[in-house]
Amino acid sequence: MCSVCEGSAEGLVTRKRTHSGGGRSAGSKRKWHRRMGGLSFLIFFVIGSLFSGLMFALLSYAPSYRSRVTPHYLPDGRFLQIADEARVLEPYLSAAVRLPDSLNGTPAGKQQQTARSNEQEALSSLKVAVEMKLMGKDDKALRLFQHAMALSPRHPEILTKYGEFLEHSQQDIVTADHYYYQALTVNPSHSEALANRQRTASIVEHLDQKRFERLDKKRDALSSVHALDAGLKRAEKEAYIQHIYHSVGIEGNTMSLAQTRSILETKMAVDGKSIDEHNEILGLDAAMKYINATLVNKNDFITLKDLLEIHRRVLGHVDPVEGGEFRRTQVYVGGHIPPGPGDLSILMSRFEGWLNAEQSFLMHPVRYAAMAHYKLVHIHPFSDGNGRTSRLLMNTLLMRAGYPPVIIQKQHRHKYYDYLQVANEGDIRPFVRFIADCTERTLDLYLWATSELSHPVPLLAQEEMGGAIGEREHGFGREGGSTVHEGSGTGDSIRIGTMW
């Protein structure tokens, strides 16, 4: 073979060897990639399995963890919406809900330690008070009892012993019965409180009934006054202004009686007072005109629609968007949480049913009106204006029964709130008596204003007039003209209606 052919043959062999070696190298790479792909899939599968198992374990563990940890449903204290009006617990709701200790600024452990220390000191004071009572030193005993009550106001033994002291040494059986009632609320099996309550309950009920009979007699005496009597007309017009002045004043409005009168008569602004204070007066004015025109002599039930219409006018100048609408947010007051917005529909439906139930109509009108006020102010269905609306409802019910509207004086606001709190704790009778006392003072003022005889000035008139019987600022005097313009309209007086 020639050298050229031999060279060509050797080159061909070399190329075949090179090609064969490259093929083996590419095959190895493909096998390596297949192996790495399978390994990557295995790694991802293992990691995914571990992650899934971990998540399953966490989800399975979470419920048991939540069950052992006390939940914090409430936001931080600085985000709480604090309402300015009092409310009480509804009788048909099971119990009050209190804010967690973490929100009241004092550690729970320190609170418990302070409570135990106060209780020990209270019991020591109680022991000495009982000794002073036996020695006939009633003044010292009274101060010691009051000190013990201030330290531990919910201790059943202190409540019972203090009640016995009031009943036997102070002849105050009504307050004594209330303390026996409170003691049984804390400890229903307290033997002494049970025995005392069995003795006093019927007596106190009889006294309450006599109070209502006295109110009925005064109401009947006022009903005998001719509707066109000049004194009655002046009294009605002044009561209209006084009701607005005191009702907004209870909620913190700083307008004086003269300024309130000026706004209602002239509709002119008062210097130095906020727009909201003006609008609160105008809103209550509109609500009372609506009540006089529609509800006082309405021969039908009072419905939720009526309540919403009252509230729509109460807030009509302050917050027209919220006026006549149930609140849509949770609100908080002190240590109590009112019903949530989701419960308002059913609670207000129950309230409407109670308001128009035959059993409710059988109550004395003053008790019925006071309880309606109590129930509505607890449910707190509105974002604002609950107290004003509740007082308007109470007076609507009283006027439909022939009573004048009750004037709850702003200087008695703390007593008013205290009695609501007592009702919150389970005994509504003190609040009913408070409303009865306000009703009697108002009746006395009407009777004095319409009487031709020279009677002493009623207590309410003395407080408002500062002892000046004929003072023009008060406007209830029998002599001279009324301080309210005669042309202010029929809606500018509170009229006494009749029961349907």
From Swiss-Prot:
Localization, UniProt: Membrane
Domain Fido: 302-437
One Gene Ontology cellular component: membrane
Main location: membrane
Annotated site location: Important for autoinhibition of adenylyltransferase activity: E251
GO biological process: protein adenylylation
Keyword Ligase in annotation: no
Regulation: The side chain of Glu-251 determines which of the two opposing activities (AMPylase or de-AMPylase) will take place. In response to endoplasmic reticulum stress, mediates de-AMPylase activity. Adenylyltransferase activity is inhibited by the inhibitory helix present at the N-terminus: Glu-251 binds ATP and competes with ATP-binding at Arg-391, thereby preventing adenylyltransferase activity. In unstressed cells, disengagement of Glu-251 promotes adenylyltransferase activity.
Record's bilayer topology term: Single-pass membrane protein
This protein's UniProt keywords: ATP-binding, Hydrolase, Membrane, Nucleotide-binding, Nucleotidyltransferase, Repeat, TPR repeat, Transferase, Transmembrane, Transmembrane helix
Chemical reaction(s) catalysed: L-tyrosyl-[protein] + ATP = O-(5'-adenylyl)-L-tyrosyl-[protein] + diphosphate; L-threonyl-[protein] + ATP = 3-O-(5'-adenylyl)-L-threonyl-[protein] + diphosphate; 3-O-(5'-adenylyl)-L-threonyl-[protein] + H2O = L-threonyl-[protein] + AMP + H(+)
Motif Inhibitory (S/T)XXXE(G/N) motif boundaries: 247-252
TPR repeats: 122-155, 156-190
EC assignment: 2.7.7.108, 3.1.4.-
MF term (GO), any: ATP binding
Region (Disordered): 477-500
SUPFAM superfamilies for this protein: Fic-like, TPR-like
Keyword Transmembrane helix: yes
Lineage: superkingdom: Eukaryota
Note on domains (UniProt): The fido domain mediates the adenylyltransferase activity.
Subunit: Homodimer.
Family: Belongs to the fic family.
Function statement: Protein that can both mediate the addition of adenosine 5'-monophosphate (AMP) to specific residues of target proteins (AMPylation), and the removal of the same modification from target proteins (de-AMPylation), depending on the context. The side chain of Glu-251 determines which of the two opposing activities (AMPylase or de-AMPylase) will take place. Acts as a key regulator of the unfolded protein response (UPR) by mediating AMPylation or de-AMPylation of Hsc70-3/BiP.
Protein's recorded name: Protein adenylyltransferase Fic
Species of provenance: Culex quinquefasciatus
Source species taxonomy: Eukaryota, Metazoa, Ecdysozoa, Arthropoda, Hexapoda
